[in-house]
């Protein structure tokens, strides 16, 4: 991929995480919601944040994953990324810091990333996965136009036994309007 791409929205700047973000990433990843609903290590150590920032840079260089720090006027608000980019598809993932939730940041940041995925990246399909019960993440995906494709029984590895996971998909040709989900 090469040089990291900066995305801007009305209120946010999305840019590659850098070394100066390590302390904020470490602090935010102490949140039990982030640890239970994402793939971050649990417990989360400062070294995990350091490794993540180094990996994010490597992923950008090779184009396998594109991860952006979500930044508002106050600083780091969360992360959003396109993971496992291959054969015209990727997985959309995101988390928000507790203090950034409830402001519409997830919708704003993910919309910018989806636009980039289907625009300049020319991807054909995005997938979204979440632990069954992560309704906040589900609302974001549903409002982006993702269609719920089912439940993957024991489909997600976490910080203990495997858990059931929702899976949804969005094609470049799909309408980007909220979809009805039975959840």
PLM-predicted stretches and their roles:
Residues 55-58, 114:
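Terminal output helix/cap of sensory domains in signal transduction proteins
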Residues 1-33, 37, 67-183:
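Acyl-donor (CoA/ACP) binding surface of acyl/acetyltransferases
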Residues 17, 45-47, 60, 175:
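A short hydrophobic/aromatic micro-motif that marks alpha-helical segments and, especially, helix-coil
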Residues 58-63, 146:
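Short loop/turn motifs at secondary-structure junctions and domain boundaries
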Residues 33-55, 66-68:
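Conserved GNAT-fold acetyl-CoA-binding loop/helix
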Residues 42-45, 59, 130, 161:
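Alpha-helix initiation/capping motif
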């Amino acid at each position: 991929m090469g040089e990291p791409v900066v995305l801007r929205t009305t209120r946010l700047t999305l840019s590659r995480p850098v070394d100066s973000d390590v302390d904020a990433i470490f602090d935010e990843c102490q949140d039990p919601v982030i640890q239970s609903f994402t793939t971050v290590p649990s417990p989360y150590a400062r070294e995990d944040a350091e490794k993540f920032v180094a990996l994010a840079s490597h992923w950008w260089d090779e184009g396998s994953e594109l991860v952006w720090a979500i930044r508002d006027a106050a600083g780091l608000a969360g992360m959003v990324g396109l993971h496992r980019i291959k054969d015209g598809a990727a997985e959309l993932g995101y988390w928000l810091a507790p203090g950034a939730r409830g402001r519409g940041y997830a919708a704003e940041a993910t919309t910018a990333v989806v636009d980039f995925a289907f625009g300049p990246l020319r991807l054909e399909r995005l997938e979204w996965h979440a632990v069954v019960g992560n309704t906040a993440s589900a609302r974001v995906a549903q409002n982006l136009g993702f269609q719920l494709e089912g439940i993957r029984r024991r489909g997600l590895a976490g910080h203990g036994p495997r858990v059931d996971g929702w899976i949804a998909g969005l094609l470049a040709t799909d309408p980007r309007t909220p979809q009805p989900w039975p959840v």
